[in-house]
Design a protein with these regions (language model features):
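Glycine-rich phosphate-binding loop of ATP-dependent small-molecule kinases
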Residues: 1-175
């Protein structure tokens, strides 16, 4: 599994989908699973964080189906916290993890992208909450992943979809 990680607006789903297509893997997106399920609309419409145990259940039920089939996954979004890492590790997720691609995008660029994407839960307060949440959780998440032996590879997420994807593909070829 290759995990694509970054804040809201960094291009996780765009790059995850494209990468899965190029590598012939299954694409799973935490954000898309959440939006498609509609079980979490009360949280997402306000920018509130979904309780971690509920979120992990949703992620695991979808990941397990892919791992049981072939295990070749590009996953974007979560886990977003140390607590989620621990819960997912109990499910055996990280024995499948090759490395994490961390998309680095400045906040001004994130806000510019978010303003043009057109999702119904998009508004500036929700975006700022999501960016703040990522900033608060990402450092400890990345430290925990490194502690567990998972390689973290930073990629400049600024540029066209094709430019960013080319950077990621070069990184994959090196690893």
């Amino acid at each position: 599994m290759i995990l694509i990680y970054g804040p809201a607006g960094s291009g996780k789903s765009t790059q995850g989908r494209l990468l899965a297509e190029k590598l012939g893997r299954t694409w799973l997106s935490a954000g898309q699973l959440i939006r498609d399920s509609h079980r979490f609309d009360e949280y997402t419409s306000k920018g509130a964080m979904i309780p971690e145990n509920i979120l992990v259940d949703l992620l695991w039920e979808n990941m397990k189906a892919v791992f049981d089939r072939d295990g070749e996954v590009v996953f974007d979004g979560q886990p977003g916290s140390v607590e989620q890492v621990g819960m997912l590790e109990k499910c055996g997720v990280f024995k499948h993890t090759e490395f994490v691609v961390l998309l680095k995008v400045p906040e001004e660029e994130l806000l510019k992208r978010l303003a043009t994407r057109g999702r119904e839960d998009d508004n500036i307060e929700v975006w700022k909450q999501k960016i703040t949440y990522f900033e608060q959780k990402s450092y400890s998440f990345l430290i925990e992943m490194k502690r567990r032996g998972v390689k973290i590879c930073e990629v400049d997420g600024v540029g066209s979809v094709e430019e960013v994807n080319e950077r990621i593909m070069k990184l994959i070829q090196k690893n």
